[in-house]
Amino acid sequence: MWLAIVVGLLVSYLLGNLNGAVCISALHHDDVRSHGSGNAGLTNFIRNYGRRQALYVILIDAGKTVLACLVMGLLLEPYGYYLEGRTLGGLMVMVGHAFPALLGFRGGKGILSGLFIGISVDWRIAVIALAVFLGIYFATRYVSLGSVLGATTLSLGFVLFYYDNLLVMLCGIVMGALAVFMHRANIIRLLQGKERKTHLFRNIKE
């Protein structure tokens, strides 16, 4: 079983290194991280390339996340730990997304990954976290604030639904905490009133 765990964790982490924003910006012979906030995430991509190509970013990041959860789950299923495997795979793909060794450890903040981890593990958690994100975003136009509160809700969802499964619950807490940690600079700007509002559903560039 330990070999399956090691292989699953490594595969999930490496899948996390496949960053959608970096991949699509590379098609333009560019690097999204050289623009705006310097972050390899969906928001920075939309700000600099518009939302028409954002779908490809979403597909890549969603695909790698779901695949990581599935692979890790299948590896541990013979040992009776399918749910735990999916959750561990989700945690490691998020770590790989945030700290990608193949991209100089300059990755994204993990919000999109967190959403699809929630979908892969328990759709109820994903729906609640997404509802919080959208509610806060439409009320304030602050993607970062919606992301932080959505990530916090993700963790709370795992606590609520999996309090009887310590490993799954702890993985969920760590995932939410990691996403919040990745937004630490945004949190400081929010507190200082310097955070930039974003119109995700309005084209900036075509």
Where are these regions (language model features)?
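Nucleotide and nucleotide-moiety/phosphate-recognizing core
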Residues: 4, 8-9, 53-59, 63-101, ...
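Transmembrane alpha-helical segments that form the membrane-embedded catalytic/substrate-channel core
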Residues: 13-22, 90-101, 177-186
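Loop-to-transmembrane alpha-helix initiation sites
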Residues: 127, 143-150, 164-175
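Membrane-embedded alpha-helical segments of multi-pass transporters/permeases
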Residues: 21, 69-70, 102, 138, ...
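N-terminal signal-anchor transmembrane alpha helix
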Residues: 2-27
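Interfacial segments of multi-pass membrane proteins
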Residues: 44-51, 72-75, 92, 96, ...
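Cytosolic, membrane-interface loops and tails of multi-pass inner-membrane proteins
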Residues: 22-54, 188-206
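Short, non-helical or kinked segments that cap or interrupt transmembrane helices
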Residues: 31-42, 102-115, 142-150
